[in-house]
Amino acid sequence: MKMSALFVIFGLALLFCNSFAAELKATGRGCGGLMDGCDGKSTFCCSGFNCSPTWKWCVYARPGRR
């Protein structure tokens, strides 16, 4: 019983990873979304996000934010 539960959990995790990789490959975005790493030189944030100079990841663009 324990072994079959482990197989189910492992199978679901494998399915999730496979679908995530397929979607990432299909979209092929060249820009970063929320909390994606950026440096402002070679990697950039998508529209609506700014690269945080402190944390080096994309954050929501807000009025008054540098």
Curated annotation (Swiss-Prot):
Q: According to the UniProt entry, which residues carry Proline amide? A: P63
Disulfide bond sites? C31-C46, C38-C51, C45-C58
Q: Where does this protein reside within or beyond the cell?
A: Secreted
Mention any one GO cellular component term assigned to this protein in its UniProt record: extracellular region
Does the keyword section mention Transmembrane?
A: no
Respond yes or no to whether keyword Disulfide bond is given for this record. yes
Q: Its domain of life? A: Eukaryota
Alphabetical list of InterPro entries matching this protein:
Huwentoxin-1, Huwentoxin_CS1
Q: Which GO terms describe its molecular function?
A: ion channel inhibitor activity; toxin activity
Q: Which UniProt key words apply to this protein?
A: Amidation, Disulfide bond, Ion channel impairing toxin, Knottin, Secreted, Signal, Toxin
**Signal sequence residues:** 1-21
Its UniProt domain note says: The presence of a 'disulfide through disulfide knot' structurally defines this protein as a knottin.
Q: Could you tell me what this protein does?
A: Probable ion channel inhibitor.
Instruction: Output this protein's name.
Output: U1-theraphotoxin-Cg1d 1
